[in-house]
């Protein structure tokens, strides 16, 4: 997820919260009664906990996945553990934006936290892989509401003069959680159980919800818009959500089945691919028909910056999340590291991302032009992904530390720039909408391409096992957890299977290389513009 940007803070300073978020007529800032002192501190603590929670959940599971595959006896669902969360996180961004506009702000936020907690609870008690995936999907729906709701509550709680600083604090919370996630997940998995990666969400979410419930008092300007329920339903774009979810699920199922569980020419695989195409066309027609009521208002894509920023973040975030989810598998299955050790070993990637994402925001504020950061970040990530492709059974620490550091720097330089660039070229009334659009493409990239990496990994793994160990069932290998290989296989068999794992991971990293390369090319389409330029994107239709 994109961190809150400098430009977003500047935009907020120039508008009343209800103007851009709640859909009401602008009210003078002096009429707003903002909390202060202890009340404000407690509200901010609740919001920081909420954002920490969401950021933590995007990364904490990465180092736990190999151990999860041990318990559920399959490596075929690795991609779904990330994709299910990102898919619903992306698809319900616009829906929650409408919910906060038409329903009471505090109750809506608490409902989002409750939904996230229910999803986390399902994950924590899951007895099989399917239940875990369902829990991740439910948690993603709640996470979408928490992320947008947190910034809405902040806008109604903090005076514009202090809002930029508070937004920066939320960004810091996000970055800390993103770095801590793999470490915490690895520690839980090694010393207790991977289920604590989800149990931990319950007390943190409870504290956040309790603080907001007690201390946040929604001002009159935050009152829900009085609109008939039929109109509210239309504004939610339920048809768009159903069509989009159906299309992406068809595509993900085709990736999961094709080449491993079923042949690519199998009727089920072909049928899901055809269904994906038809549903995607229907979704596009639906969005064009609904216009301003659509999940993704088409008029905003008439501008070069928003179009190419969205496409860039779609491919670029896919590359990032693919590396984040599959490097722990390399460390734990191939190198024999524990879950906690693999969390430490991914620090060059996540630390580089966190540090240079902060730096890129400062640099962009100085130079103004965003294309150089997009291009440089894309080039570094492409090269680093290519270097990670060379990792083998005997690769040393110097290699994986240096390659990850380069990837982290490249990702950090560019990952939040599309959000800042898009926010800089729209008017205040479109700020929340364009933010949701960029976040949608970022999360959708994670959902689709983590699963694409899974397909590449599994297909290659099965092919290598069938080629070199014809007497061993490929299903036996894929049903063996990633960290159980050493105990399940021995001698020559183990050596061949580890080499097959490396070959599968290399194919997954090829996907990351291609995605980062496409993003680099797209960076040139964003245009040589400065975030300090006058806004020129299409104006909202009346």
Curated annotation (Swiss-Prot):
Q: Where is this region: Disordered?
A: 1-30
Q: How does it sit in the membrane?
A: Multi-pass membrane protein
Chief location of this protein? membrane
Pfam families referenced in this protein's UniProt entry, alphabetically: MFS_1
Q: Where is the secretion signal located?
A: none
Q: Which residues, renumbered to this chain, are glycosylated?
A: 18, 471
Record's superkingdom?
Eukaryota
Q: Name one GO cellular component term.
A: plasma membrane
Q: Which UniProt keywords apply?
A: Cell membrane, Glycoprotein, Membrane, Transmembrane, Transmembrane helix, Transport, Virulence
* Function as written in the Swiss-Prot or TrEMBL entry: Efflux pump that provides the dual role of gliotoxin export and self-protection by allowing the fungus to evade the harmful effect of its own gliotoxin production. Moreover, it also contributes to the virulence through gliotoxin secretion.
Q: Which organism is it from?
A: Aspergillus fumigatus (strain ATCC MYA-4609 / CBS 101355 / FGSC A1100 / Af293)
For bias type Basic and acidic residues, the affected ranges are 1-11
Protein name as catalogued: MFS gliotoxin efflux transporter gliA
Q: Which gene encodes it?
A: gliA
């Amino acid at each position: 997820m994109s961190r809150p940007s400098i430009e977003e803070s500047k935009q907020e300073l120039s508008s009343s919260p209800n103007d851009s978020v709640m859909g009401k007529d602008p009210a003078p800032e002096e009429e707003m009664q903002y909390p202060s002192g202890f009340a404000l501190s407690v509200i901010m603590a609740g919001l920081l906990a909420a954002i920490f929670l969401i950021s933590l959940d995007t990364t904490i599971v990465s180092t736990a996945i190999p151990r999860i595959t041990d318990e559920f006896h399959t490596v075929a669902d690795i991609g779904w553990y990330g994709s299910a969360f990102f898919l619903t996180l992306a698809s319900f961004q616009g829906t929650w934006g409408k919910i906060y506009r038409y329903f009471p702000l505090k109750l809506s936020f608490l409902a989002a936290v409750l939904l996230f907690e229910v999803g986390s609870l399902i994950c924590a008690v899951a007895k099989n892989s399917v239940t875990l995936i369902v829990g991740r999907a439910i948690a993603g729906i709640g996470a979408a509401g928490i992320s947008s709701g947190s910034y809405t509550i902040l806008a109604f709680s903090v005076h514009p003069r202090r809002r930029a600083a508070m937004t920066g604090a939320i960004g810091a919370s996000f970055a800390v959680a993103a770095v801590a996630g793999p470490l915490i997940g690895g520690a839980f998995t090694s010393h207790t159980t991977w289920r604590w990666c989800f149990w931990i969400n319950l007390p943190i979410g409870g504290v956040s919800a309790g603080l907001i419930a007690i201390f946040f008092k929604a001002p009159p300007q935050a009152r829900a818009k009085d609109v008939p329920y039929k109109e509210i339903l239309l504004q939610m774009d339920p048809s768009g959500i159903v069509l989009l979810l159906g299309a992406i699920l068809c595509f993900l199922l085709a990736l999961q089945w094709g080449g491993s569980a079923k042949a690519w020419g199998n009727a089920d695989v072909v049928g899901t691919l055809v269904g994906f195409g038809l549903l995607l066309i229907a979704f596009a027609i639906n969005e064009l028909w609904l216009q301003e009521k659509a999940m993704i208002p088409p008029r905003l894509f008439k501008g070069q910056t928003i179009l190419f920023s969205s496409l860039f973040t779609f491919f670029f975030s896919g590359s990032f999340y693919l590396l984040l989810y599959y490097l722990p598998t390399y460390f734990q299955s191939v190198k024999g590291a524990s879950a906690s050790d693999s969390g430490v070993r991914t620090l060059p990637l996540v630390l580089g991302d966190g540090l240079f994402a902060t730096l890129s925001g400062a640099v962009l504020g100085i130079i103004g032009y965003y294309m150089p950061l997009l291009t440089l970040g894309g080039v570094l990530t492409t090269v680093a992904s290519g270097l990670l492709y060379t990792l083998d059974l005997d690769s040393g620490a110097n290699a994986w530390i240096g390659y990850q550091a380069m990837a982290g720097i490249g990702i950090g330089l560019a990952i939040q720039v599309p959000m800042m660039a898009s926010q800089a070229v729209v008017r205040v009334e479109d700020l929340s909408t364009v933010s949701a659009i960029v976040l949608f493409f970022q999360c959708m990239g994670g959902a689709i391409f983590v699963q694409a990496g899974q397909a590449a990994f599994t297909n290659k793994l099965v092919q290598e096992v069938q080629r070199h160990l014809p007497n061993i069932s490929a299903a036996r290998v894929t049903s063996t957890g990633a960290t159980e290989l050493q105990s399940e296989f021995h001698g020559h068999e183990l050596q061949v299977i580890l080499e097959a794992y490396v070959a599968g991971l290399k194919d997954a990293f090829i996907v990351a290389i291609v995605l980062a390369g496409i993003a680099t090319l797209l960076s040139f389409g964003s245009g040589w513009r400065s975030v300090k330029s006058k806004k020129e994107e299409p104006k909202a239709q009346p």
